[in-house]
Amino acid sequence: WHFNNGGKEISSGANAAMGLSLPLSIGAAVAEKKNQVLSVTGDGSIELNIQELKTISHYKLNIKTFVINNGGYVSMKKWQDNFFAGNRLDTEDLTGVGTLNFKKIAKAFDLKYELIKRESEINSKLSKIMSNESPYLVEVITDPNQKIYGKEF
């Protein structure tokens, strides 16, 4: 990663700590009040600390939370594909776990909301989001069958 103007990345060493993105982003926003903070998390991962959206909203922290929505728990899908011959249970809408409605969640926590469905929308929507100092919840729809790489299970 290359960051301009002294930007930094804060993450877990393995980039695999579910639920860590929101607490880290809050800490960064409080420590560096003048800077904008970007938080990237998954649609399953955010469920572990979703209450932190209230903290972000209450203190009007300049955090843009990007939720990568692939319609389920991709790491669990990978585990089930590798060790259970692709027999899936409770990893996506089709197997018993519904995806959250992030637009309603943003409204409930009094956050601005933006939806990115296509690559062609990214530049224009990012310009709008990044030019605003309000906290945002940004849902980014991705391919539910996208392969993930990294730690093997």
What is the role of each PLM region?
Residues 1-153:
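Thiamine diphosphate
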